[in-house]
Amino acid sequence: MIALLLTAAGPALAQGVAFGGMRADTSAPVEVSADNLSVNQSDGSALFTGNVVIGQGEMRLSADEVTVEYAAGGQERIRSLTAVGSVTLVSGEDAAEAGQAVYDVDAGSVVLTGDVLLTQGQNVLSGDRVTVDLASGSAQVQGRVRSVLQPGGN
């Protein structure tokens, strides 16, 4: 089981976290489903609303609404996804909840903000902002960080 590794640098500093299950194949197709879709051809964006679920490999993100921004040149490649409202991100045994998440497809990173809560087995970690590197599975937690770590747990 993956253990949370915290850097004890003080509550005002960013905390390092091993978030190994939160990885995704950033070259895999991104699948989006929702109740409604509005497309804006002029700025290369799409707005999905209502029960939005996004999947890429084993990673799943759900939210109230998601704005998809396409790379320059058309809707062939997604540049970023911005999820707002009841955001949940799940990959393997790792899960995260937040008010907002921004997934930068090219950078392979997800930035979660707004009462972020991470769970890994019975271990829980919360903070103001979490940046997850999907290639390495590492994360940085910033703001007032609180954690509950179970001895002998995962």
What are these regions (language model features)?
Residues 1-154:
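Mature-chain termini and adjacent capping regions
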